[in-house]
C-alpha cells in the first residue's frame, strides 16, 4: 500500500466530506436565482458559510468564497493595494508563491516592497518590522505574512504582527492555508484584516477556498460580474463545494505530535530539521540531507511507494531549490537537498517507521548520483 506523506500538497477527501459533497452535488439551482430551486441552493450555501465561519472564528458575512488559496491571496494583496492607494508592501521572501508572485506583479505596477529579514529558522525579524513601520507607516499599503510556513511548518507570531501594525493603522493579510485546523487560528481574535484558507489541505475538494475579510476592511475586487460575495468576488457560487469545505473545516485533525516526535527521532541521525527548535506545527517537517539531491531522494522514495515532496507543489511540477530555505540563508546545495514530509488523518506510526527504514539506503544512493 503506498505511503502518502505529502498532505501539505493536498490531502485526500475525508469520508465524511465525500458523503456530504456527493449529496450536495445533486442540488439543482443557482444560488442567485429567485425561484424555489435557487433559494434552496442559496439556503445550503449560506448554511455552509455559517458553519465555516464558526470553524474560522469569524462572522458569516466575513467569509468570501473563492476558487482556493491562490485566488484568496491575490484578492487580498491586490485588493488592499488598489483600495489604499499607497505604494509600500511589507512581506518576506519565505512566503508561498501565491503571495510572492502577486507582490512581484505589483512591483511592475509601481509598488515598492520591503522584504523583512528572516532568521535561519524561518521566523521574521520583529525588530525589522517595527523599524519599517515606524519610519514608513504612512506609505504602507499592507503587510502580508503567512501564519504557518507550508514548507517548514514554522509559525509566525501573527498576534504580535497585528498588534504592532494596529498602532499605525496598517492592514495585515495572512496566508492561513497551512495554519487553519493545524493550530489555534481564530480570525476574530487575530487582529488580521484578511486571511486566505483552502479546502483541499484539510481533506476537502480542490478548487474551493475562502478569503476571510474583516467587516472593517475594504478591498477592490479582482473579478467583475454579478456582484456575488459582498461584491468582492463575482461568479456563480458552488454550493456543493461550500458544503464540502464546511464539513472539512468542522472535522478535527488528529493530534500529530507523536508522529512528529517519532519522525524527528528517526530521521535526525540522517538529516537536519530545517526549523530547528523554533515552534512549528507538528504535521509539517522539513529536513535537509547533506550531499544529496532532494529530487533524487524523492524519486528513490517513490520507488518504495513513499510519497514526499521537496517543498511547495505550486511550482508547476518543476523541482528546484527551495526559495524558502534560500531566504533562510541556506546555500543552493543545501536548499536543493530538502525533503518535506507532511501528515494527514491516515498517517500512522508504521508509515513513519517505513520511511525511516527506507531512508538510509536512499540517502546513500542519492549521495552517489
Give names to the regions the model predicted.
Residues 1-369:
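Pyridoxal 5′-phosphate
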Amino acid at each position: 500500500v503506498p505511503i502518502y506523506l505529502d498532505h501539505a500538497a493536498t490531502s485526500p477527501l475525508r469520508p465524511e466530506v465525500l458523503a456530504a459533497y456527493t449529496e450536495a452535488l445533486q442540488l439543482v439551482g443557482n444560488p442567485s436565482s429567485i425561484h424555489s430551486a435557487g433559494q434552496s441552493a442559496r439556503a445550503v450555501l449560506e448554511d455552509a458559510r455559517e458553519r465555516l465561519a464558526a470553524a474560522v472564528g469569524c462572522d458569516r458575512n466575513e467569509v468570501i468564497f473563492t476558487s482556493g488559496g491562490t485566488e484568496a491571496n491575490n484578492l487580498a494583496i491586490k485588493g488592499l493595494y488598489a483600495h489604499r492607494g499607497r505604494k509600500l508592501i511589507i512581506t518576506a521572501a519565505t512566503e508561498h508563491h501565491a503571495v510572492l508572485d502577486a507582490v512581484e506583479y505589483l512591483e511592475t505596477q509601481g509598488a515598492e516592497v520591503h522584504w523583512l529579514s528572516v532568521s535561519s529558522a524561518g521566523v521574521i525579524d520583529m525588530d525589522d518590522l517595527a523599524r519599517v513601520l515606524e519610519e514608513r507607516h504612512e506609505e504602507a499599503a499592507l503587510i502580508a505574512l503567512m501564519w504557518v510556513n507550508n514548507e517548514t511548518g514554522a509559525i509566525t507570531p501573527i498576534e504580535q504582527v497585528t498588534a504592532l501594525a494596529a498602532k499605525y493603522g496598517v492592514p495585515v493579510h495572512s496566508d492561513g492555508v497551512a495554519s487553519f485546523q493545524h493550530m489555534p487560528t481564530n480570525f476574530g481574535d487575530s487582529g488580521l484584516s484578511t486571511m486566505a484558507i483552502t479546502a483541499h489541505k484539510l481533506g476537502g475538494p480542490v478548487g474551493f477556498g475562502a478569503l476571510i475579510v474583516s467587516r472593517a476592511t475594504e478591498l477592490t475586487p479582482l473579478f467583475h460580474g454579478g456582484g456575488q460575495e459582498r461584491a468582492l468576488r463575482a461568479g456563480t457560487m458552488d454550493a456543493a463545494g461550500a458544503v464540502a469545505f464546511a464539513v472539512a473545516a468542522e472535522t478535527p485533525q488528529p493530534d500529530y505530535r507523536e508522529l512528529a516526535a517519532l519522525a524527528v527521532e528517526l530521521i535526525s541521525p540522517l538529516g537536519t530539521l530545517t526549523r530547528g527548535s523554533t515552534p512549528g506545527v507538528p504535521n509539517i517537517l522539513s529536513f535537509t540531507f547533506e550531499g544529496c539531491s532532494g529530487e533524487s531522494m524523492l524519486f528513490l522514495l517513490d520507488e518504495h511507494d513513499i510519497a514526499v515532496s521537496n517543498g511547495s507543489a505550486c511550482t508547476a511540477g518543476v523541482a528546484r531549490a527551495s526559495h524558502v530555505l534560500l531566504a533562510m540563508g541556506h546555500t543552493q546545495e543545501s536548499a536543493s537537498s530538502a525533503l518535506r514530509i507532511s501528515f494527514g488523518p491516515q498517517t500512522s506510526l508504521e508509515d513513519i517507521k517505513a520511511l525511516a527504514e527506507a531512508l538510509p539506503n536512499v540517502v546513500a544512493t542519492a549521495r552517489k548520483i
